[in-house]
Every structure is written in C-alpha cells, then in structure tokens.
Amino acid sequence: MNKYLTLADGTQWIGTAIGDCQLEAAGRIVFNTGMTGYQETLTDPSYLNQMIAFTYPLIGNYGIDPTVAQAPTIGAQAIIVHELATFNDHYTSRQSLASFLTIHHVAGIEGVDTRDLTIHIRQTGAQMAILSNHPITDFEAQLATFAPQVLTATPLPVATTTIRPRVAILNFGEKAAITAELQARGADVVVLPPTASLKAVAAYHPDGILLSNGPGDPTDYHTYLATIRQLAQRYPLAGICLGHQLIALAYGAQTYQLSFGHHGLNHPVQACADGRIIMTSQNHDYAVDPASIKGTPLIVTHTELNDGSIEGLRLPHQAVMSVQFHPEAHPGPQEAGQFFDDFLLTIQKEAVVNA
C-alpha cells in the first residue's frame, strides 16, 4: 500500500508502507548518516517523537540481534528508507528488520530518495512531518490529532552488590551501552529515575553521578537544574548528550536548536587541551551556545570540527565533566571511551581526597 510522507513546508514523498503498515505517525524528521547500526539507532530513547530518515540506501541487511538493542522498545516514531532489505544475512540475526518494526508497532516508508530528503532538510532545517495512508490536505489539523509520546519512568532499584565504585545514573532516556561501559570497567551501576530526590540518591551511597542522554529540548528539564547543582556539590558528576546540556544550563549557560542536528557515526571532535581528534557517534538536535559560556564557571574541553559547536565541558574546581557526543558509541566508533576512564579516575581521586 502507498504511504505519504508530508513535511510541514508542504513537500511530499510517496512510497510503500513498511512495518505496521496501517499505522500513521507524526514527529520531527531527522536524518541519520550511519551506514550500520540501525538497530541501536532505532532503540535509542533519545529518538522519541522523531522520524528517522536513513541516508544509506539499503537498511536491514544484517537483521536484528537482540543483544545490541539499547532499550526494550523502539524509540523512534517512524522509519524512512530508500530500500528495506528482504533478507537478514548475519549469524547473530534472530529476525528481520521488517518483522521487528511490525512487532513494535512502528510505521515506516520505503522507496523514498532519502538523500534527496536529507538535502531538503539541510536546506530548510528540521521540521515536523506526518507519515499517512492518504495525501494530507490540512497539515496543521492532521498534526493536532497526534499526541507526543513520553518515556516511562524507571522505578527505584534495589542495590544488590557492594562493588566499588558505584555510579548512579539519572535516567533521562539512557542507552544500555552506557551501563555496559561502566560495568566493563569494574563499576557497580544503579539506574535511578531523574525525579529521585537527593535523599533517595544518597541512600544508594554512590561514588559518582552520571546524567544520561535523553530526548527533546533540554530547557524542558529546567525543574532538575537545582538538583544537578546540589549533586555536583556532593559527588563527582558527569553528563552525556542531554546530561551535558543540563549541566550547562545548571551553571548558567544557554542552549539552542541546531538547524538539522547531528545524527551519525562519523563526527570529528577535537580536544582543546592537546588537539587530539576522535571520531564520534552523535545524536542531538540541541547544543550549548558558545556565547553563553562567558560569565559561567564552565570551560570548553571539546569542539566539533564541522560546525565548531561545543562537544565537552568541565568545571575547573569541581569534579564535573560532560560530553555532547556518545562515548559509549553503539553504534559507531569506539575512540571516545576514554571519557569513562577519566570519570572513574576522577571518582577514585575524589575518594582519596575525601578519605
């Protein structure tokens, strides 16, 4: 059956329905330039309320491996591809991408020239879009019929080990790979809801706090900023992606929306201290405003080489550090994992100082 992709500016593409074929969807359209990693991308909670257009022309050729999912469900509202593979040729595959989309009730469209779509987004900026079963005649009226999705809050867990160091992750939409990277380095991890009070966090006796990635506009999380500052006074604090932006806001900086976001696996980032360049995985539509850093205690540690946007921050006299990119990758290059080593080393040093 036909599927219609309509952008807010009236531009339309017609293709064939995939996934949950009868389902219609709406969300902010973004493009992802990764040649691989579609499963990790689709299950990244940061893509909540977004429709992902994959620029690589063939998606789904190595199927679905349940061990690499970043969350139990698909975060994206819809998937847009040029061609969906009819085979899944990999020894780890347990099902096709087509069946994965159907089981998780995700709408999709194939037969779209996603590179043409990407050029259009780059020229006009990110915008809302609707994936429908019929042509759209009144975009705003149709858009009003869709309700945005919200993440389910994580309950308070039960700490079952005495392993040190213990890192408490405030889960704004955490990818599973973040926990895995910390555990691979010997840390115990407890994942807490972002609404956890200082008292609730303290009950787990953490040695450090990590603010996770997550979806949406960072200014929508303003109610957490005071708690973030209080946590930074008591524990070493790190932030990834949204967590990075929240640390910036908590210390007086501002954020802004990028024209079309960073969504891909090959973003070059340079460390300000030594000039070292790493390739990073990125997924964000907002960034910290460089002009707003002046007058705050924050110091820029990393920048993106394509557009000069801020990719890392720290506080010089507190154990606070953050990065805009995804050091855990999954998908993407593994060059940025040093961030976790640095954070755990900071925790170790703070433990010695406070002993």
UniProtKB/Swiss-Prot annotation:
GO terms for biological process: 'de novo' pyrimidine nucleobase biosynthetic process; 'de novo' UMP biosynthetic process; glutamine metabolic process; L-arginine biosynthetic process. It holds the Pfam family GATase. Its EC number is 6.3.5.5. One of its GO terms (molecular function) is glutaminase activity. This is Carbamoyl phosphate synthase arginine-specific small chain. The active site is at C241, H326, E328. Induction: Repressed by arginine. Keywords: Amino-acid biosynthesis, Arginine biosynthesis, ATP-binding, Glutamine amidotransferase, Ligase, Nucleotide-binding. Small subunit of the glutamine-dependent carbamoyl phosphate synthetase (CPSase). CPSase catalyzes the formation of carbamoyl phosphate from the ammonia moiety of glutamine, carbonate, and phosphate donated by ATP, constituting the first step of the biosynthetic pathway leading to arginine and/or urea. The small subunit (glutamine amidotransferase) binds and cleaves glutamine to supply the large subunit with the substrate ammonia. It catalyses: hydrogencarbonate + L-glutamine + 2 ATP + H2O = carbamoyl phosphate + L-glutamate + 2 ADP + phosphate + 2 H(+). L-glutamine binds at S46, G214, G216, L242, Q245, N283, Y286.
